[in-house]
Regions:
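One-carbon transfer enzymes
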Residues: 2-378, 382-391, 401-407, 418, ...
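Trp- and S/T/G-rich repeat-edge/linker motifs of beta-rich repeat architectures
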Residues: 365-367, 412-417, 469-473, 523-534
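Short loop/turn segments immediately following beta-strands, especially the blade-tip
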Residues: 407-411, 461-467, 517-527
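Blade-level signature of beta-propeller repeat domains, shared across WD40, Kelch, NHL, RCC1
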Residues: 512-518, 539-567
Length: 567
């Protein structure tokens, strides 16, 4: 992760004060505190515990005040939302790693000194104001940075208390939306991605900027989406704090702030009713697909095209899926007079993929056989050439490795060559040579929640088969589920072109794809520009496409259908 360097840096550990509301704490705060225990460059030295005047009210008085201020239906809608959320957690959040996001922890479980303050909520607006005595109390602690662990927005002197200001994690896309309730509105609006931003606020005006932004595929339900974005974002809060001590307090190079002063908006009863209908429709469609034995099924097509920029995809020649299987992730290659297409060959019966190869000759094609078959899943057969030798880097994420295989006899005989990385959650790797270095692009899951579609990481080495790759200074170089995961890679003269996948709502894998030109790549910089977008509209009834391959006039693409499968 890259953080702009500034003049003011510190050599000791960064002292952090964590601002939390009084009461039980959510799993995200627990996760950050736990990660801080192994931090090298920072420590959470104090919990700044906020208590508000209205928290002294009993339950009946609080309900009366809310009804008087906001109307009768607001507390009813809140109660309904809690009920929906609890049901979704029970039914849909099965993974213990995700479910832990909703665990609650008493303040006494955190063995960190606690400083109690009573900020003032203004009658209008969202900016919490701290009283002078509380500000002096915090100043006396010698804290370097405050970390915001609650939902409010700050104003006034609290922004000047620490040299590094306040670091705040904002869920949602504050660039375009002013509605609150993190992770809900993205599901309700069926948006393909759910975003978060980590920003730093400095000075009375709250100036500063965004330290980083990221997005992940939007999950089908509110509870799933909230768990996933919570787990993903807290990993990067920890990493950011690790790097902040050496980066300094300067705001030079920060992204434009995504802060909005629009008031938070919780869903009304009408919105919640519509949300339930949408969720039931998704569940009903999935039940119908199961009962009718329908499943997602990929297919592959190819064609000849003088230029990759203007293929007539609708005229692609489709390779029929074999019984009980599907073909995906095509990579075409020419050697001599032989034209072939390597594919992921997935078997529904074994629930595992292998690598197969088809020979192509004009409108005709036929299966040559299996290229690689391992006791684990294989896909994405990326091929590259070094000194007239061919190597394949297929996806081997099931065993937590990035592996390399060498061609013994083209195109069918390949053997294991070397493991480039171990103990990594990485998929769809591209390897290429540029400016005296070998580069490796792959998508990681830093949070261990199974999201391998959002973070593009770059590495470099002096050797293509090194097992010691240096990470790029700005990793992840792309943090966006609509453009991070690779779907191919090829050259057009001196131009480097990376195919990227665009994930859809409900974690629809490979809804569409695009092609980006890599304009600049070195150990400190990564810059790419989208030059083409391809939608799933070139074959009837398809719902996705996610791999594009081009080699010397031969082009291949894949597509996704929902159809009956006999396993």
């Amino acid at each position: 992760m890259y953080i702009p360097a500034g003049a003011a840096t510190i050599m000791r550990k960064l002292s952090v004060g964590y601002i939390v509301d009084d009461g039980r704490q959510p799993g995200a705060i627990h996760d950050v505190i736990e990660k801080s225990k192994s931090a090298e460059n920072y420590s959470i030295d104090y919990l700044i515990v906020q208590t508000f005047a209205d928290e002294d009210e009993n339950l009946l008085k609080r309900i009366y005040r809310i009804v008087k201020e906001r109307g009768f239906f607001t507390p009813v809608a809140r109660a309904l939302l809690k009920a929906i959320f609890a049901l979704e957690v029970r039914l849909f959040v099965r993974d213990p790693r995700l479910k832990s996001a909703f665990d609650l922890y008493g303040l006494d479980t955190f063995h960190v000194p606690k400083i109690h303050v009573r900020p003032v909520k203004p009658a209008s607006g969202r900016g919490y104001r701290y009283r002078d005595d509380d500000l002096e109390k915090i100043k006396s602690l010698g804290i370097d940075v405050l970390l915001n662990g609650q939902n409010g927005v700050f104003g006034g002197g609290i922004l000047d208390v620490c040299e590094f200001g306040i670091v705040s994690l904002d869920h949602g896309d504050n660039e375009t939306a002013g509605e609150g309730l993190p992770a809900f509105w993205e599901v309700f609006n069926r948006e393909p991605s759910t975003r978060f931003a980590i920003q730093r606020l400095l000075g009375e005006s709250g100036s500063g900027g965004v330290l980083m932004r990221g997005s992940i595929p939007t999950a089908p339900t509110y509870a799933q989406n909230l768990a996933r974005i919570s787990k993903k974002s807290t990993v990067f809060v920890h990493r950011l704090l690790e790097n902040l001590a050496t980066a300094g307090a300067s705001t030079e190079g920060l992204l434009e702030s995504s802060h909005t002063d629009n008031p938070c908006k919780n869903p009304s009863l009408r919105v919640l009713a519509a949300y339930q209908i949408k969720t039931l429709n998704i569940a009903a469609q999935r039940v119908f697909n199961i009962l009718s034995r329908k499943d997602y099924r990929w297919g592959v097509g190819y064609q000849y095209a003088q230029r990759w920029q203007d293929p007539a995809l609708a005229k692609s020649i489709l390779i029929a899926n074999p019984p009980h299987r599907f073909l995906a992730d095509p990579f075409v290659f020419r050697r001599g007079n032989l034209e072939v297409c390597f594919v992921e060959d997935y078997d529904y019966r074994t629930k595992r993929g292998k690598i197969s190869v088809f020979q192509i000759s004009g409108d005709e094609h036929w299966e040559l056989g299996t290229v690689l078959d391992e006791p684990f899943h294989l896909s994405y057969p990326f091929i590259f050439e070094v000194d007239n030798e061919l190597y394949m880097c297929p996806e081997t994420g099931e065993i937590g490795e990035i592996r390399l295989y060498k061609c013994i006899e083209f195109p069918l005989r390949w053997s294991y060559h070397k493991t480039l990385m171990r103990d990594v959650a990485a998929v769809d790797t591209n390897i290429f040579f540029l400016q005296d270095k070998w580069w490796l692009l792959t998508t990681f899951d830093s949070s261990e929640i199974g999201d391998v579609c959002s973070e593009l990481h770059a590495f470099y080495s002096d050797s293509f088969d090194s097992d010691a790759w240096t990470p790029h200074a700005k990793n992840p170089v792309v943090f966006d589920s609509e453009r991070a995961r690779c779907g191919g890679f090829f050259r057009d003269g001196e131009k480097l072109l990376r195919v990227f996948q665009r994930q859809g709502f409900g974690s629809l894998y490979g809804e569409s794809m695009g092609i980006a030109r890599i304009n600049h790549l070195d150990p400190e910089t990564y810059d790419e520009e989208t030059v083409s977008i391809m939608e799933p509209d070139f074959v009837p009834s398809i719902v996705g496409t996610h791999t594009f391959s081009y080699c010397d006039g031969l082009l291949a693409i894949d597509y996704l259908k929902i159809e009956q499968v006999k396993a």
